[in-house]
A protein has these predicted regions:
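Metallo-beta-lactamase
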Residues: 80-135
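Conserved beta-strand hairpin/beta-sheet module of binuclear metal-dependent hydrolase folds
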Residues: 1-44, 126-143, 160
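Structured catalytic core of nucleotide-sugar glycosyltransferases
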Residues: 6-17, 53-73, 85-89, 99-102, ...
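Cap/insert and terminal regions of metallo-dependent hydrolase folds
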Residues: 148-171
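Active-site metal-binding loops of divalent metal-dependent hydrolases
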Residues: 9-10, 30-32, 59, 118-121, ...
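Short amphipathic alpha-helix with an adjacent loop that forms part of the alpha/beta core around
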Residues: 41-45, 104-109, 151-154
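Active-site metal-binding motif and surrounding structural segment of the metallo-beta-lactamase
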Residues: 33-80, 159
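Short internal beta-strands
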Residues: 76-84, 164-165
Length: 171
C-alpha cells in the first residue's frame, strides 16, 4: 500500500497538504477559503466529503482559516494541539480532538500521525510524521524556523520529507 502526498498549496495566502493511504484521506492544514479548498481537492480528483480528518499544525490563519468549517461541512474529525485549539476558540472534544506533542494519532489502520513540536514565532507549531499501514513514513514540516534534535530523529527513515522553511520572524 502506498501513501500519496499532494501539496494543495503553500504560502502566506494558504497552506494545505493531502495525505492518502488506502481509503484514508487526511488534510494537514486547511488555510484556503472553503471554496478554494474544495476546488483544489476536485483538481486532484478527491471529493471533499471523503476527507476523514484535518490536522492543523498551528493557529496562523494561512494554516487554519477554514479548518473548523470544513470539518463540519465534510464531517471530518478536526485535530489540533491544545494551544492551537484554545487560540482558535475550538472546544476540545466537542469541536476538536486535541493532542500533545509526540502523541500518536490513529486515524485508521491505513494511516497514523505523529505531531512533533517545532520552533516558530509561537509555541503551538507542530510537524507531522505520517505512517501508513505498511510502516512507510512521510514528514510534513511547515513554517520551520530551525530544526531540532527531536525532529531530526523522526525524519530518519522517512521516504518523503516536505519542508517549508520560508518563515522570517523579521517580516
Amino acid at each position: 500500500m502506498g501513501m500519496r502526498i499532494t501539496h494543495l498549496g503553500s504560502g502566506s495566502r494558504g497552506n494545505s497538504t493531502l495525505l492518502c493511504s488506502g481509503g484514508t484521506r487526511v488534510l494537514v492544514d486547511c488555510g484556503f477559503s472553503l471554496r478554494q479548498m474544495e476546488s483544489r481537492l476536485h483538481l486532484v480528483g478527491v471529493e471533499p466529503q471523503s476527507i476523514d480528518a484535518i490536522l492543523v499544525t498551528h493557529h496562523h490563519s494561512d494554516h487554519s482559516r477554514t479548518a473548523k468549517r470544513a470539518s463540519e461541512k465534510w464531517e471530518a474529525t478536526l485535530h489540533a494541539n491544545l494551544e492551537t485549539a484554545t487560540k482558535m476558540g475550538w472546544q476540545p472534544m466537542s469541536e476538536c480532538r486535541t493532542f500533545g506533542g509526540l502523541d500518536r494519532i490513529g486515524i485508521s489502520d491505513d494511516l497514523s500521525l505523529l505531531p512533533i513540536p517545532v520552533p516558530h514565532d509561537d509555541a503551538d507549531n507542530v510537524a507531522v510524521i505520517a505512517t501508513n499501514g505498511d510502516g512507510r513514513r512521510a514528514a510534513i514540516v511547515t513554517d520551520l524556523g530551525e530544526s531540532t534534535v527531536e525532529l531530526n530523529k523522526h525524519l530518519i527513515g522517512c521516504s518523503h520529507i516536505s519542508i517549508e522553511a520560508n518563515y522570517d520572524s523579521k517580516r
